[in-house]
Regions:
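Short, polybasic Lys/Arg-rich linear motifs in disordered N-terminal/cytosolic regions
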Residues: 1-273
Length: 273
């Protein structure tokens, strides 16, 4: 699995997100899932998660092509979901500027300078390099537009996890092996997912994933959603930062003005955002 190492690597990912999903300056979509395991002997509540099962956590970042560019596997299921990403080496390097992320630059067709960011859902804490949706209560029109535009990019990681579980069905039921070997099984699945994504045109079919028709403004959920067995992280309100809120406001204003797309007004109603 190749983790981007240079600024040019990251810029290529951002270009793909802009072209395919109309989200500028996006470096990847982040999400996490609980991989259900059989309770290890004498482990007490160490792996006991908020859903009442036993698990380890798979945290993943994907590019615009449904490929994993980073995974962290093995946090026990009882850990606070909001703390999973915070305790990864990736997060540590991001906060200490060791990832070679691109410097803030001007957004297309504007004079607005914005940083490059990852996108996630409400299980994660917003900051200057990680954007998440506005909470779904009393949203303004502009906030609904932002949430829709972010959802287009964020759904890529949801679909990557869904396809992963559909193709590697060991992830769809409690894994009954020594808990210390579970991360190896999960890593092998993620690595094979990337390989097959690159090598097989039939690995991901159109019906597998969520699809939008931006001309008719219709949405079709991916087939994996009919049998989604991976438990998501607990989506609770996380601490917000002033920098994170400011960056989100920059993108909100941009997507409602210079960066708007012709279908967004109809789609927020189609998708009830």
């Amino acid at each position: 699995m190749y983790v981007p190492e240079t600024e040019n690597d990251w810029l290529q990912i951002a270009k793909d997100f802009e072209i395919k999903w109309q989200f500028n300056h996006c470096l990847g979509a982040i999400d996490g899932k609980h991989v259900i395991i059989e309770k290890p002997p004498k482990s007490g509540t160490l792996y006991y998660n908020y859903k009442g099962t036993f698990s380890i956590v798979l945290l993943g970042i994907v590019n615009a092509n449904y490929e994993f560019i980073y995974v962290n596997i093995g946090s026990n299921g009882s850990i606070s979901d909001g703390g999973v990403f915070k305790h990864t080496t990736f997060h540590e390097k991001m906060k200490s500027n060791q990832l070679n992320l691109p410097s803030p630059s001007i957004l297309p067709q504007s004079n607005v300078i914005a940083p490059y960011c990852f996108v996630a859902d409400n299980a994660f804490a917003i900051n200057e390099n990680l954007l998440k949706p506005y909470p779904r209560r009393n949203l303004t029109h502009d906030q609904r537009i932002f949430n829709y535009r972010l959802s287009r990019a964020r759904r890529i990681v949801e679909n990557a996890f869904g396809i992963l579980a559909e193709r590697f069905r060991v992830l769809k039921r409690p894994i009954q092996i020594n808990v210390h070997n579970v991360p190896k099984v999960v890593m092998a699945s993620c690595t094979l997912h990337n390989y097959l994504r690159k090598k097989s045109s039939n690995y991901i079919t159109r019906n597998c994933v969520d699809t939008e028709d931006t001309e008719t403004c219709t949405f079709r959920p991916g087939d994996w959603r009919l049998n989604d067995n991976l438990v998501g992280l607990n989506r609770t309100e996380r601490q917000r930062t002033a920098d994170g809120n400011s960056v989100r406001q920059i993108f909100t204003e941009y997507f409602n003005n210079q960066g708007r797309v012709h279908f967004q007004e109809r789609m927020i109603n189609t998708m009830n955002i």
